[in-house]
Regions:
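Accessory cap/linker subdomain of secreted extracellular hydrolases
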Residues: 41, 46-71, 78, 278-380
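Catalytic-loop region of hydrolases
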Residues: 30-136
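C-terminal catalytic histidine-bearing segment of alpha/beta-hydrolase fold enzymes
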Residues: 363-364, 368-370, 394, 411-466
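Short, surface-exposed "cap/lid" segments of acyl-processing enzymes
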Residues: 117-126, 130-192
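Short alpha-helix in the alpha/beta-hydrolase fold that links the catalytic acid
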Residues: 385-386, 399-409
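Primarily recognizes the serine-hydrolase "nucleophile elbow" in alpha/beta-hydrolase
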Residues: 227-297
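Alpha/beta-hydrolase active-site loop
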Residues: 181-184, 191, 212-233
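Short beta-strand/loop motif that positions the catalytic acidic residue
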Residues: 383, 388-395
Length: 466
């Protein structure tokens, strides 16, 4: 039965990625020559229409493949340059919009840049910068979309920027597979005339463990990614930007939005889309236990141990041999292969006393304090720009209530927030369908929302009504 459920889960992930990639081949609509924002079609999406990607032959495909996941580009110098968001180096990154990476429309480059971790220490992280293929038809200068990735995994090979043609990568050492399933959304923004900066987040691609769903670090990495991207593109630091992310990326975008006024006040943030954010990790851990993506619990715990060495002893204290194997295995897995290895594993089978990881997280003050510090709209609450937050009422991965409560806290702090509920009925709970499908159906309305913010249209808000 578990084998069937695992295969079914992998099929769902494959379908979601394929559906997203179909957006690229189907094309996106580009606004006409008016100063107004693009007109949505009947579905409310700008992600449909007649735009066709450049018709050029794709060279023989080969994803990055390194037995140890290493790549010299991602290894920072021993001494980092001063400043936050300082570009250390760049490298051409051919992609479907410009296979020659010739500096023209649609060309992309990887960047390695500086940021800070939760302890205020300077570290290097990476990302990619994608130039527009279309002309910005809206108000003012072409904006920059800062895209924060949904869950890719914990291994270096899983980083979006490390994928060949910004699509795919493979670690032949452990079989980890990187599928850049959000590339179509980046291509859509490029077609609308936006610059796109895709951040990898700390430890994903670069040395050290990826600090998965550590919102303190995801926020700084995204803000410094904006700084680095603008600098690399030769744009003023007050150029209009917006944050766009779903799932892990939704949490990262929200984290950037709430830290922007204190960490990067010079940035001209126009708006944020935070889709299905894992805002309260202690609530989320119960949802993903005995679930298709149980492996993400390992991603999160390994990330917490990376920053809090005092928690290392928890493994010997609580985990049995299977639990320790789970922790070791998920350190460098990507999400697809983590499903293949750990789908529908009940964490009670991995602890010495039969308690779940969630029960342990609630009862151990050391662990609960760390996870609580990553909670959104907690330490930082003040947004300096409007936000659209969306969560499925029946999302089987990210609880609707914790997202709703997060939006409410932003409202209470004076934020302009539109909180929307995706109405998809419950479908095969635990198989990620109710989490993955809204990523596709809400992408168009989310892009429209940001286009309106870039055009200085009044932002909607339903604070006090949800």
């Amino acid at each position: 039965m578990k084998t069937f459920k695992t295969r079914m889960s992998q099929a769902v992930l494959t379908f979601t990625a394929t559906s997203a990639l179909a957006i690229t081949s189907a094309g996106v609509a580009v606004a006409d020559d008016t100063p107004d924002s693009p007109s949505p079609d009947a579905s409310g999406s700008v992600l449909s229409g007649e735009f066709v990607l450049p018709g050029i032959d794709v060279p023989p495909f080969s994803g990055e493949s390194n037995a140890d996941g290493s790549n010299p580009f991602y290894v920072p110098p021993e001494t980092l340059p001063e400043g936050k968001g300082t570009v250390i180096r760049s490298q051409d990154a051919p992609n479907l919009l410009n296979l020659e990476s010739n500096g023209g429309p649609g060309s992309a480059e990887r960047i390695l840049y500086t940021t800070t971790n939760e302890h205020g220490e300077q570290v290097a992280t990476s990302g990619a910068v994608l130039k527009p293929t279309g002309k910005w038809q809206g108000k003012g200068p072409a904006p920059t979309l800062v895209a924060t990735p949904g869950t890719r995994g914990a291994g270096d090979i899983c980083a979006p920027s490390r994928s060949s043609y910004q699509l795919y990568g493979f670690d032949d050492g452990n079989g980890a597979i990187n599928l850049n399933y959000e590339y179509p959304f980046h291509a859509a923004a490029s077609a609308l005339g936006m610059n796109v900066v895709v951040v990898d987040l700390i430890g994903l691609g670069t040395p050290g463990q990826h600090t998965y769903v550590n919102h303190l670090e995801e926020g700084t990495a995204a803000l410094d990614g904006a700084r680095a991207g603008l600098s690399h593109l030769g744009l003023p630091e007050d150029s209009p930007i917006g944050f766009f992310g779903y799932s892990q990326g939704g949490g990262a975008s929200a984290a950037a939005a709430e830290q922007a006024s204190s960490y990067a006040p010079e940035l001209n943030v126009k708006g944020t889309f935070a889709g299905a954010p894992p805002a309260d990790l202690i609530e989320v851990v119960d949802y993903v236990d005995d679930h298709a993506i149980t492996g993400v619990i390992g991603f999160a715990l390994n990330g917490a141990l990376e920053r809090h060495s005092d928690l290392t002893g928890l493994q010997d204290e609580y985990f049995n041999d299977q639990g320790k194997q789970f922790m070791a295995d998920t350190k460098d897995r990507c999400i697809g292969d983590a499903v293949g290895r750990w789908a529908f594993t009940d964490t009670r089978t991995m602890t010495k006393d039969g308690r779940s990881f969630g029960e342990i997280a609630r009862s151990d003050e050391r662990l609960s304090e760390v996870l609580d510090s990553y909670k959104l709209a907690n330490r930082y609450k003040n947004l300096n720009a409007p936000m659209l937050m969306v969560n499925g009422k029946n999302d089987d991965t990210i609880p609707w209530q914790q997202a709703r409560d997060t939006a409410a806290r932003y409202c209470e702090a004076g934020g302009t927030v539109q909180f929307n509920t995706d109405p998809l009925p419950e479908v095969l709970p635990g198989f990620v369908i109710n989490h993955a499908v809204p990523m596709l159906t809400q992408a168009g309305p989310a892009m429209n929302y940001l286009v309106d913010r870039f055009n200085d249209k009044p932002a909607p808000s339903n604070c006090g009504k949800f």
